[in-house]
């Protein structure tokens, strides 16, 4: 402080030789006051910048938390959907294997009937031990009387009905 007042005195003496000590004290006090106000204003601006930075970081944290929550929700939904589709795929794979096995068995039966068809009588093929169809004049079966082809339990006597796959909702 002594250096600033001595500097001021040297400059004031160059102004005209007015060496009034009260004037120099007033100007030094006014400079101190201005510097103090300037420092306060600078500190206030610094605090405001710091607070704005903290507020910006808080807003960024909130935004990232929301994004993280949305991603976790999306991941949960996707995982549940994946598990559901995987379960359906397992059921469909099991049904496909079952149907493939049935198809293979039916193809083996067809191959057996076709390869040994001449050796089997019709009564052996229909599974009942007899043939209730009548042979017409031309040597072909006469199926005009359809009631003779129906058994008393409500089904056809013939066993070559298609085999249906189990329904997915049956389990």
From Swiss-Prot:
<keyword id="KW-0238">DNA-binding</keyword>
<protein>
    <recommendedName>
        <fullName>bZIP transcription factor 2</fullName>
    </recommendedName>
</protein>
<dbReference type="Pfam" id="PF00170">
    <property type="entry name" value="bZIP_1"/>
</dbReference>
<keyword id="KW-0805">Transcription regulation</keyword>
<dbReference type="GO" id="GO:0046982">
    <property type="term" value="F:protein heterodimerization activity"/>
</dbReference>
<comment type="subunit">
    <text>Forms heterodimers with BZIP9, BZIP10, BZIP25 and BZIP63. Component of a ternary complex composed of BZIP2-BZIP63 heterodimer and KIN10.</text>
</comment>
<feature type="region of interest" description="Leucine-zipper">
    <location>
        <begin position="57"/>
        <end position="71"/>
    </location>
</feature>
<dbReference type="GO" id="GO:0003700">
    <property type="term" value="F:DNA-binding transcription factor activity"/>
</dbReference>
<feature type="domain" description="bZIP">
    <location>
        <begin position="29"/>
        <end position="92"/>
    </location>
</feature>
<feature type="compositionally biased region" description="Low complexity">
    <location>
        <begin position="1"/>
        <end position="24"/>
    </location>
</feature>
<feature type="region of interest" description="Basic motif">
    <location>
        <begin position="31"/>
        <end position="52"/>
    </location>
</feature>
<comment type="function">
    <text>Transcription factor that binds to specific DNA sequences in target gene promoters. BZIP2-BZIP63-KIN10 complex binds to the ETFQO promoter to up-regulate its transcription.</text>
</comment>
<dbReference type="InterPro" id="IPR046347">
    <property type="entry name" value="bZIP_sf"/>
</dbReference>
<dbReference type="GO" id="GO:0003677">
    <property type="term" value="F:DNA binding"/>
</dbReference>
<feature type="region of interest" description="Disordered">
    <location>
        <begin position="1"/>
        <end position="54"/>
    </location>
</feature>
<keyword id="KW-0539">Nucleus</keyword>
<keyword id="KW-0804">Transcription</keyword>
<dbReference type="InterPro" id="IPR004827">
    <property type="entry name" value="bZIP"/>
</dbReference>
<dbReference type="GO" id="GO:0005634">
    <property type="term" value="C:nucleus"/>
</dbReference>
<dbReference type="InterPro" id="IPR045314">
    <property type="entry name" value="bZIP_plant_GBF1"/>
</dbReference>
């Amino acid at each position: 402080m002594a250096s600033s007042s001595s500097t001021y005195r040297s400059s004031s003496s160059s102004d005209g030789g007015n060496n009034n000590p009260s004037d120099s004290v007033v100007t030094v006090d006014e400079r101190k006051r201005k510097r103090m106000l300037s420092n306060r204003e600078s500190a206030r601006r610094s605090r405001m910048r710091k607070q704005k930075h903290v507020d910006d970081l808080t807003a960024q944290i909130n935004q990232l938390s929301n994004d993280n929550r949305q991603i976790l929700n999306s991941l949960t939904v996707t995982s549940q959907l994946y598990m559901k589709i995987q379960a359906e795929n397992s059921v469909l794979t099991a049904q496909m294997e079952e149907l493939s096995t049935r198809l293979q068995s039916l193809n083996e039966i067809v191959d057996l009937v076709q390869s040994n068809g001449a050796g089997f009588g019709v009564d052996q093929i229909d599974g009942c031990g007899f043939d209730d169809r009548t042979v017409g004049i031309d040597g072909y079966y006469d199926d005009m009387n359809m009631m003779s082809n129906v058994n008393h339990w409500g089904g056809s006597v013939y066993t070559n009905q298609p085999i249906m796959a189990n329904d997915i909702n049956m389990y």
